[in-house]
Amino acid sequence: MTTNIHAQRILILDFGSQYTQLVARRIREIGVYCELWSWDVEESDIRDFNPDGIILSGGPESVTEANSPRAPQYVFDSGVPVFGVCYGMQTMAEQLGGKVATSTEREFGYAAVQVTGESALFKDLEATQDVWMSHGDKVVEIPSDFVKIAETETCPYAAMANEEKKYYGVQFHPEVTHTKNGLKMLENFVLNVCGCEGLWTSASIIEDAIARIKEQVGDDEVILGLSGGVDSSVVAMLAHRAIGDKLTCVFVDNGLLRLNEAEQVMEMFSEGFGLKIIHVEAEERFLSALSGESDPEAKRKIIGHVFVDIFDEESKKLSNAKWLAQGTIYPDVIESAASKTGKAHVIKSHHNVGGLPDDMEMGLVEPLRELFKDEVRKIGLELGLPYNMLYRHPFPGPGLGVRVLGEVKKEYCDLLRRADAIFIEELHNADLYNKVSQAFTVFLPVRSVGVMGDGRKYDWVVSLRAVETIDFMTAHWAHLPYDFLGKVSNRIINEVGGISRVVYDISGKPPATIEWE
């Protein structure tokens, strides 16, 4: 009998902090299932979810302003432990009778917190804690049934607690790595205060996913779009373990893949792991559908629709294929406003979620839908997939379709593939690949004058992009050595006919996104 890995659960209410997904990932690291919902969730949804504890996230608003977000009153009537982080602490204080004021000194960065009282939150921790602050308001009066449990020189109530009700608030961010013992504080809350156990492990997630797939599809056949990326590869391995040859993988060479990627995918999965794979050559079909289209969102939708059309066609060739397996992961769900509350903001329409037609004829199998990327990678390792494949830099679902700016043409894709391969090869050669979080090349649809030999020529421009990030929510451009960049530029211009200029993108996120489209 499989372990019920969802038996114990934490609910995180999102007030808009850039770190909120990080809170959820930390709870999962502790070994406990959690979900991330919008702050204005209905009371009935919280009742149905039946959490063992609730975390109120940080956020950019000010509690002192009218109509700023508040926690549903049921949070404090439910009888479960509550942990407020930054804005979450402030709204907890305000809603329970305390006072919040705008601080004369905004605290941003490292701070030394002095623990002033015993608390379950700080169990087994020293009296001075290095933490990460990011706030403009502060609690100036705590509710009458709370006690102060920590302070800083400029923040009189850095943490507060009502031990009887199991309510806790901290003005800092325990979820970020800058807070040295932040994970221990979250462990104290989730394991000790809420009484959860570490049921959420890679082994138990695999066991649960296999059981769910078997239960969902029965004796039906399943079709999976295998791209060779992390998500679809892990789904393929899970489904293969669950239903064996009732899984048919469709590998679509859409003309938007990296150099030699098609050959590598077929070799690994068909020959190496023995999966049943149909190889569809569809470059012309995708490029024809994309012809004349330059809008990024429209390109994503077109690519998604053509994929589904191909799967539909291939499934009709199978006697009993009623299910389409997908590599949708939890951040896709959150970002595409397809979360269970439906209140998340659309950032980009992910091909796995927003681009699917309403009249799709197959049911969906999405075994990774509850998982973050780091969890998917850990599962992949346990399933026997190679480290280098699982920890390769992220590649967007629409592939080069969103790395060729504007209209997508075969000529542009071929040039970009070769330029990108040189960039990645040189990163490996210089031992820089694993020191950046993501690196790739972008094709710019503009011609620039160049000099070759005694003549002038007008050829295309590509941009190199490399970023460093912990969570991909924010990112810094990578300060790659000038000599390295010069070498990459020279190789691309000399070896890839048709490119006359190479530039380097030095934009951070924000204001820019990591991908250009």
Curated annotation (Swiss-Prot):
CC per GO annotation: cytosol
Keywords of this entry: ATP-binding, Glutamine amidotransferase, GMP biosynthesis, Ligase, Nucleotide-binding, Purine biosynthesis
Every GMPS ATP-PPase domain range: 200-392
SUPFAM superfamilies, per database record: Adenine nucleotide alpha hydrolases-like, Class I glutamine amidotransferase-like, GMP synthetase C-terminal dimerisation domain
Domain Glutamine amidotransferase type-1 residue range list: 9-199
PROSITE patterns: GATASE_TYPE_1, GMPS_ATP_PPASE
First-tier enzyme category under EC: ligase
One Pfam assignment: NAD_synthase
Protein origin, superkingdom: Bacteria
PANTHER family, alphabetized: GMP SYNTHASE [GLUTAMINE-HYDROLYZING], GMP SYNTHASE-RELATED
Function: Catalyzes the synthesis of GMP from XMP.
Subunit structure: Homodimer.
Protein name: GMP synthase [glutamine-hydrolyzing]
Lineage per the UniProt record: Bacteria, Pseudomonadati, Pseudomonadota, Gammaproteobacteria, Vibrionales
